């Protein structure tokens, strides 16, 4: 894949420093994956396509050239927030993940790539007490979109956006409404090379989420909103 060309088609142009940051990120991912099991994808072309490029397709849903705060819930090895931070150094990023080994890996990434304004939080999303704090909240490949909505919507500022990246989903609009949001659009596209389908939902926060949300994760999982 011609990473530079494909990003230009998204309206993203990287300088030499940013390209070097992506190269270093790839090297760290492969190195630490041997002991941490961070990803099942290690081939360089596939990492650039399915992790780096895929993360940056969020520009289809939002203008990241603005000075905004972004919270990435369940980021794993840093997707989509670290690629977004490399491409848009102006954004302030908070990453929340429940697995400490992933947070430790991301500390190394942030240090080695000289990234600033990145905060790494080891916590479960439902226990992360920053309601109505972020312009944008992202999540990638959460198994159940309704669970993702309950975990993430409380974190979004009124007039901010939740941008879940999904492959498929079964969504009731009443769930979005119950959590203070409205579905603005579904953005559907295909990854280059393999033509696999991707979807980004653009959910705007129109009113404050009720204080009772999010519930405990056991309650969320046992009885997800419908």
Regions found by a protein language model. Give the residues of each.
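Residue-level signal for inorganic ion chemistry
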Residues: 29, 84, 203
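Short loop/edge segments at beta-strand edges and connector loops
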Residues: 42, 122-124, 185-187
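SAM/dcSAM-binding transferase cores
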Residues: 175-226
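Short "lid" loop at the C-terminus of a central beta-strand within the Rossmann-like core
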Residues: 126, 144, 167-171, 189-191
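Conserved SAM/SAH cofactor-binding pocket of Class I
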Residues: 56-141, 149
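Helix-to-beta-strand junctions that scaffold the AdoMet/dcAdoMet cofactor pocket
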Residues: 88, 156-158
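Conserved beta-strand signature within the Rossmann-like core of class I S-adenosyl-L-methionine
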Residues: 159-169
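Class I SAM-dependent transferase core
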Residues: 1-65, 71, 101-118, 216-217
């Amino acid at each position: 894949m011609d990473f530079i060309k494909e990003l230009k088609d998204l309206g993203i142009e990287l300088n030499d420093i940013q390209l070097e940051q992506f190269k270093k990120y790839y090297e760290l991912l492969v190195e630490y994956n041997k002991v941490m099991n961070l990803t099942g994808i290690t081939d360089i072309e596939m990492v650039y396509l399915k992790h780096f490029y895929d993360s940056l397709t969020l520009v289809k849903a939002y203008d990241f050239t603005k000075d905004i705060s972004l919270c990435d819930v369940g980021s794993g090895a840093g997707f989509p927030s670290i690629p977004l931070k490399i491409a848009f150094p102006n954004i302030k990023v908070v990453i929340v993940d429940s697995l400490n080994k992933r947070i430790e890996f991301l500390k190394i990434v942030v240090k080695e790539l000289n990234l600033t304004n990145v905060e790494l939080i080891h916590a479960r999303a439902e226990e992360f007490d920053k309601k109505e704090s972020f312009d944008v909240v992202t999540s990638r490949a959460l198994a159940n979109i309704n669970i993702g909505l309950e975990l993430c919507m409380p974190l979004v500022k009124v007039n901010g956006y939740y941008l879940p990246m999904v492959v498929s989903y079964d969504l009731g609009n009443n769930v979005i409404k119950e959590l203070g949001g409205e579905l603005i659009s579904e953005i559907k596209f295909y990854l280059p090379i393999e033509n696999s389908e991707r979807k980004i939902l653009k959910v705007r926060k129109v009113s404050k989420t009720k204080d009772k949300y999010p519930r405990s994760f056991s309650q969320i999982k046992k009885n997800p909103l419908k």
